[in-house]
Amino acid sequence: MAGIGPITQDWEPVVIRKKPANAAAKRDEKTVNAARRSGADIETVRKFNAGTNKAASSGTSLNTKMLDDDTENLTHERVPTELKKAIMQARTDKKLTQSQLAQIINEKPQVIQEYESGKAIPNQQILSKLERALGAKLRGKK
C-alpha cells in the first residue's frame, strides 16, 4: 500500500497576482528600520509644496512693483447725489416707506437705504426695478 501516509508535493506553491508593496507601505517606520538593519540604501525626499496651492497663491510677488508704482486712487463709483435725491423724492411722492419700496422690487430694505444714503454701487438692474416701481425716470437725461 503505497498510498498510506502523509501526502507530499514535489513542487513549490506559487502565489498569483500578489500586489507589490505600495509607496505608503514602503515609507512606514517598520520597513525603513528593517532596511537600515539590512544595510540597504535609504533615500528620504520631501516633496516641495506637496498638498498645497502655494504656487497659485504666490501671485502677489509678481505684480508688487506695478502695485507700488500705481498711485491712482481706486474706488468704486457710488450713487450720485442727484440720483439719491430723485429716489427719495419719487418714493415720498408715492407715500412709500423704504421697506415697502424694497418689498415691491424684491430687494432688502438695506439696499434702498444704501441707495438713498449714497453708499451703494449703482446696479442697472436695481435702478430699472426702482424706475418701474416708482414710475419715474432715474437714469439718463430727464
Swiss-Prot record:
Induction, as annotated:
Not induced by heat or cold treatments, H(2)O(2), dehydration, abscisic acid, 2,4-D, ACC, methyl jasmonate or salicylic acid. Weak induction by salt stress and pathogen induction.
Keywords per UniProt: Activator, DNA-binding, Nucleus, Transcription, Transcription regulation
- Note the superkingdom of the native organism: Eukaryota
- Family annotation (SMART domains): HTH_XRE
Its tissue distribution reads: Expressed in leaves, roots, stems, flowers, siliques and shoots. Detected only in anthers and some seeds in siliques.
The ranges of region (Disordered) come to 51-77
Q: Drop me one GO molecular function for this one.
A: transcription coactivator activity
**Where in the chain is the DNA-binding region found?**
98-117
Ranges annotated as biased composition (Polar residues): 51-64
Give the CC-aspect GO terms. cytosol; nucleolus
Q: Which Pfam family is one of this chain's hits?
A: HTH_3
| UniProt domain HTH cro/C1-type: residue ranges | 87-141
Q: Which Gene3D superfamilies does the annotation name?
A: lambda repressor-like DNA-binding domains
Q: Where in the cell is it found?
A: Nucleus, Nucleolus
Report whether Chaperone shows up as a keyword of the record: no
GO BP term, pick one: positive regulation of DNA-templated transcription
Q: What does this protein do?
A: Transcriptional coactivator that stimulates transcriptional activity by bridging regulatory proteins and TBP, thereby recruiting TBP to promoters occupied by DNA-binding regulators.
Question: What protein family does this chain belong to?
Answer: Belongs to the MBF1 family.
**Domain description from the entry?**
The C-terminal domain (75-142) is essential for nucleolar localization.
Record's protein name: Multiprotein-bridging factor 1a
Q: Which organism is it from?
A: Arabidopsis thaliana (Mouse-ear cress)
At the highest ranks, the source species' classification is: Eukaryota, Viridiplantae, Streptophyta, Embryophyta, Tracheophyta
